A protein has these predicted regions:
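Glycine-rich phosphate/cofactor-binding loops in nucleotide/flavin-utilizing enzymes
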Residues: 14, 151-160, 164-168, 255-309
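A short core secondary-structure module
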Residues: 68, 72-119
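Internal helix-loop-helix
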Residues: 1-29, 33-38, 80-86, 209, ...
Length: 309
């Protein structure tokens, strides 16, 4: 990501590892290897109009019909659905489960199947989508994991996603570009980089980046040891995403009004990358689960505090 090339990190870092572990051999051979070759993009279908943070209350249904599943429902905030080859979809397969999360199953839905459609949802930052599933007839081979065993896959995938949101390479490259810009920009008879307040801002950014890097390395090691916990992933997500928002603010202070010019406007500095990152940065604090909920997870799974008083 440091290089700046397009990189579908939700596909490669968040969904593909779960498919590699839990999908059947055909999916591993076609989809997972397609991801490795850079040929496959996967969107995530979790949130619904009435189910966001409370994901276990989702209503999209999958009903078995022989060797197929009939899927009906709607998802919201399905980023990349307009590009994706598949949607990693959570659907309810048991309407009478004792606990709602025990009636969910995971599917991989090809976006070229009849019955799938999407419409754009424009935000302040990037485009996302509403996706619709109308009597999609899906072969059972696209089911991932056990029937009604989807919750475990969802939580595992979300742990990966929360870490993927705080990879520091792209942000570190932006920091280095701003440092170089400040070193080249005249100010008060010298260079902007020589100003004490600029140095203070950049020092705060550099320190935070080093912390995020160490967190990422620690969690990467945990994944290698198959020991990544919910609390650890949530800690990384909360610290990293909130620091990134602060980082963009500090760098914008250094660049001033030049940093607020959008990429396709005359006078844009650094191709408008800082303006764009600052504008979309807040989505990281609720993508993959709102940070308020992550703090609850840290309290329960990391500090062993009770769910209720």
């Amino acid at each position: 990501m440091r290089s700046g090339f397009p990189y579908p990190f939700l596909t490669t870092e968040a969904v593909a590892p779960v498919l590699a572990e839990h999908a059947n051999d055909e999916i591993r051979e076609t989809v997972v290897k397609g991801v490795q070759r850079g040929e496959v993009v996967i969107a995530i279908g979790y949130s619904e109009p009435d189910a966001g943070t409370d994901l276990a209350s989702l209503k999209t249904r999958a009903e078995r019909d022989g060797d197929h599943w009939i899927i009906n429902g709607q998802k919201m905030w399905t980023s990349l659905a307009n590009y994706a080859d598949y949607v990693w979809l959570a659907a309810r397969t048991d309407q009478n489960a004792e606990k709602p999360h025990r009636g969910l199953t995971m599917f991989l839905v090809p976006t070229d199947f009849e019955g799938f459609s999407h419409t754009p949802v424009r935000t302040m930052g990037v485009r996302t989508n509403a996706t619709f599933y109308s009597d999609i007839r899906l072969p059972d081979k696209y089911r991932v994991g056990e029937v009604n065993g989807g919750w475990k896959l969802i939580t595992g995938q979300l742990n990966h996603e929360r870490l993927s949101l705080v990879t520091h390479g792209q942000v570190a490259a932006l920091y280095e570009a701003v440092c170089q810009w400040a070193a080249d920009t005249p100010a008060a008879g010298g260079k902007l980089l020589e100003q004490p307040w600029v140095q203070a801002n950049l020092a705060r950014v550099k320190t935070g980046l080093e912390v995020v890097k160490l967190i990422c390395w620690k969690q990467a090691w945990s994944m290698d040891q198959d020991a990544l916990g919910m609390a650890e992933a949530s800690m990384a997500k909360v610290y990293g995403t909130e620091f990134f928002v602060e980082l963009y603010r500090l760098l914008l202070e250094v660049m001033g009004q030049a940093g607020t010019i959008v990429s396709d406007s005359p006078g844009a500095i650094l191709q408008g990358k800082l303006e764009f990152r600052y504008r979309v940065g807040s989505v990281l604090t609720f993508g993959g689960g709102a940070n308020e909920v992550q703090r609850d997870i840290i309290a329960m799974a990391g500090l062993w505090m009770p769910r209720t008083r």
